Amino acid sequence: MSKEETQEIRQVQKEEEDNAEQEEGEVEEEEDKKSENESEEEVELEESKEKKLKSGNEVNKSSIKRRRSLYAGFDEKQDLFRPEFRFNNHDPVKEKMWALMDTYLKRDKLSVQKSIVQHIEYTLSKTRFEINSQYLFQGTALSVRDRLLEQWNDTQIFIKINNPKKVYYLSIEFLLGRLLQNALVCLDLEKCYKDALNEFGIKIEEIYEEENDPALGNGGLGRLAACYIDSMATLNLPAWGYGIRYDYGIFRQAIQNYEQKEFPDYWLTKGNPWEIMRLDTQFKVRFYGYCRDSSKNGKSCREWVGGEEVIAVAYDTAVPGFNTFNCNTLRLWKSFPSEEFDFEDFNRGDFQSALSDKDQASYITSVLYPNDNSLSGKELRLKQEYFFSSASVQNVVNEFSKLNLPWSDFPKYNTLQLNDTHPTLALVELMRILLDEKGLDYGEAFYIVQKTFNYTNHTVLPEALEKWGVDIFERLLPRHLEIIYLINYFFMEEVK
């Protein structure tokens, strides 16, 4: 801590605190100085390790540098985290950035308070005269998210280094509940934030009440999915949840004239401080069109062309585990148009047509379980299920491709769990990718799919099992219907 910062803190304490608070502040300053001294010793230790690395005593190709941090209470585990890479091609620019990222954020009360008010002023762009309980919630949540991101990023690097088998949990629902209190408990920071907010004149329970419940699920199916991804994080399993980022969720209930009225539950009215939009993670999802014979790398294949495309963009939320540094990912997909604006239609004065692609794309991720009593409703629901199944499978395939391993190893590194019937098109989508894009034979592709997927069945009642007419399926997903016929043909041949 610099002399200028120390003088500013002491000046504020003289003006706003009594003698007891001043003494407490001085104790905190001494602890900060002690932590800084320890940090300087750690840097010296790391510099000596770096010299050894340059002299060739370490692994030639690359090595991992793990720094100890200021993360209180878990010192014996710190060597597992804050990993960084060292390569032969020394880059002083990256070295400087890495040096500034070598420790965790502080967890003392004063640091937490600074973090909250800085987010209110600089992230939310609010003045000191505009602060209310909602802005305090937003600032608190963003402050907690900062500390989650440290563990989240470290977990992803740790997984990338060790390359274990990964679990992907596909569910059309995730009934998460409010996230702030769960995050604080998992980070062991609830008491610290409670004390910090008390000095702001607000109870932490009031902050909890400001959070909107994410409208991403309806009942037991979604709650089970949320419990699974939470438990897998606690069990230190490398897992991802895949679902849909709904704009309105299911519905908001109101009683008018003794009758139930349903209204959109726009849970995003106050924003969502937990999610991170991943503009670098997006995939094209096709609907309609037709299939034709083609060839790839001198090998005949089928090609799906025409129709319309939308873009699936990822929104990530950190899922912390309890009493562990492991922090997994819930990845939700939102639909965007491949061409958002038709300038020719707009210039002709046809403003509705100019934005029609944008509207059509937004319908897919608007509402959980759209009414399927009409033909258009059935089509929208099938679109919705294929949309998130396709984006999820493409994401998994894309990550595996980076390993440069044979496709026969795909089940050794990936397992996909399907939560009920809604994501079952993921099986056919993986078959399509392996057959049409990767050039595998039917036998190879089907073996990989069999070894990769698992399925949870929630009921055997016929009214709860989904059925789709061949006509609507063929119009919307022509190539997938061909693959289903192909699977059925080989199955019938096998059981003859």
Positions of PLM-derived features:
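A conserved ligand/cofactor-binding region detector
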Residues: 24, 28-31, 38-496
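N-terminal acidic, proline/glycine-rich, low-complexity intrinsically disordered segments
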Residues: 1-16
